[in-house]
Amino acid sequence: MGTAQTLGRSMVRESSAEHWDEADFRLIFQQHYARIVDILVRLLGDRAHADDVANDAFWRLYRQPALQSHGNVGGWLYRTATNLGTDVLRMSGRRRQHEEAACRIARENTPGGPLDDLLREERCRRVRHVLSLLKPAQAQLLILRSAGLSYKEIADALEVKATSVGTMLNRAEQEFRDRYIALHPNEEEL
């Protein structure tokens, strides 16, 4: 809650004539911040970077008070946050560091011995590499779905029809699978 209060106070100081209602913005922050950070941790592999990118997404939202009447603020936030996260990965010369951090997080949450840890780490590195080769929209689809978003939430975030998400997701999964197998043909199971 400290982060929400600090961010909220800071944003109120920088507000212009037209600004967000502080209570409304605080509610949006509380509803979406934790989930957006979780999605970004999966993407970036580092909680500190995920917090930074999430805060940037909320700053961008706050600077656009017209979005109060948008009706799909959550979708706008998810799309903006994943776009920003993808940009961070692309611009960073430390992609490998992010991949290793993401694998460490996965390893911390999964029991197993050193060999299991090593295999999981390598698998995470491969998955992140293949995700970086996909079209941004395909990578976003897969990341949002793996984070547990529903088809409707994904549709809202990517501004597509909810009825299209299943087909788009199938195509993204197939593209991911094809690229993964092409790069790692001897791996038994995806």
Model segments located where?
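C-terminal flanking helix
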Residues: Y33, V37, F58, K135, ...
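A short, charge-rich alpha-helical start-of-domain segment used by transcription regulators
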Residues: E14-D38, A48
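Acidic, proline/glycine-rich intrinsically disordered inter-domain spacer in sigma factors
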Residues: A23, L27, C103-S132
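Structural recognition of an alpha-helix C-terminal capping motif at a helix-to-coil junction
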Residues: D52-W59, R63, G71-N83
